Amino acid sequence: SGMLSFQFNFRRNDFPKRETSRITPCRLNEVSSLATIAGQAFVYDRFHQDYKLTAKHCDSLHEKWVTNCCVNGLADVVLVSRQDGDPSGFIACRLAGELNKVRFGEIVLVSVASNLHGQGIGGSLIQAALEWFQERTDIVFVRTESTNYSSVKMYLNAGFSLIESSNYFRR
């Protein structure tokens, strides 16, 4: 399997405007709903590709990952999209420091409820994240599995550039 790394450079790119009014920071009472979304949505990730890990264990890792983003400071903000008041997806964003007066950010984790894929929610989450990052960073990074074609397409459509491809191997 492999990973693809993308970057969005605010000094070079404009980003497409989408409707993001239904996307706001995570509320503590939504963490369990986000964990459920994360536990069910990932199938292309490196954990599920590892034959030594059970699907249940992999799902649990994602549930803990988003929980750590929301309550343990792994992310600086977790933005949540909602449909009919209920969480439909999330994006976790982290400020990653500065080097030579260039400020960096990272999209840590993105997930949309599996029954809502293909409705543009992911693209709206990316838009909301870019709006959040715009005043705080110069460059935003994100990584995804090379086999996660819908995410690759989503990042490219949002103006991200592919900057690196890497493979990883397991014994």
Q: Where in this protein do the model-derived segments appear?
A:
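Acyl-donor-binding surface of acyltransferase catalytic domains
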Residues: S1-E30, S166-R171
